[in-house]
Amino acid sequence: MFRGSHVAIVTPMLEDGALDLDRFCALIDFHIEQGTDGIVVVGTTGESPTVDFDEHDLLIRTAVSYADGRIPIIAGTGANSTREAIELTVFSKNAGADACLSVAPYYNKPTQEGLYQHFKAIAEAVDIPMILYNVPGRTVADISNETTLRLAQIPGIVGIKDATGNIARGCDLVQRVPDNFAVYSGDDATALALLLLGGHGIISVTANVAPRLMHEMCTAALSGDLAQARAINARLFKLHIDLFVEANPIPVKWAVAKMGLINENIRLPLTALSSQHHELIRKAMLQAGITV
């Protein structure tokens, strides 16, 4: 079971939109040095909707090869086609990823039974630990707690990233899942609350900008040091909110670029952060102790 702070890592790109693998590898080193507990590659924050199959495979293989066992690599493999999701999951398995993160199918609006059959088919087709990803604000499809509990009985499905931000719902889930099934927060602003209610970790956007603080907050919360966890979260809270002033990953790419780690380049239909929001993000970074 993975525990702690897992960064939903950005995908660096060159001016022409090509992948910047040199900076990608440098980011992996940065997160290892900063204490990040795991890396999610090609998730929402990694611009998965605009990364093609070959690039997807390349990013996962590069991450696994370069990390070389120094940090767990979790591969984003979701798609709104079950067949494509299986293919992406096969990529991850063959590349040697430690687990996959599979988002609920978006746009085609499956029923709860459709969601169950989708994830069941992937788990039965590919032998790799699978973390479900529920983010109805993006997908429209919402994996209910009851469906999650059904899926938790399937071998290979080991956890869920709950990005609903609904604490009551997360608390209900934590209390009812099997002991070998992990619940991860996918919403930085409410992550501490879920951790204190029994969650196992975070898959975080903020960790791109403040990886050591996110690791320390998770460690404090999971060890019962409430005062320390609350103090760190207070420093980070403005980042948690303001990194979503525009669609993720627009603001976080700007922030990581200002740290000198990547170029701000982003693929259409996403565009660079509006200048009116630059100072907002800068102030949030300064509040967290990040000099820009």
UniProtKB/Swiss-Prot annotation:
Broad class of enzyme this protein falls into: lyase
Recorded family membership: Belongs to the DapA family.
EC code(s) of this entry: 4.3.3.7
One GO location term (cellular component): cytosol
Annotated Pfam families: DHDPS (PF00701)
Phylogenetic placement of the source organism: Bacteria, Pseudomonadati, Pseudomonadota, Betaproteobacteria, Nitrosomonadales
Catalyzed chemical reaction(s): L-aspartate 4-semialdehyde + pyruvate = (2S,4S)-4-hydroxy-2,3,4,5-tetrahydrodipicolinate + H2O + H(+)
Superkingdom of this protein's organism: Bacteria
Transmembrane segment boundaries: none
Keyword Lyase: yes
This protein's name: 4-hydroxy-tetrahydrodipicolinate synthase
Species assigned in the record: Nitrosomonas eutropha (strain DSM 101675 / C91 / Nm57)
One annotated GO molecular function: 4-hydroxy-tetrahydrodipicolinate synthase activity
Subcellular location field: Cytoplasm
Catalytic residue positions: Y133, K161
One of the GO BP terms on file: diaminopimelate biosynthetic process
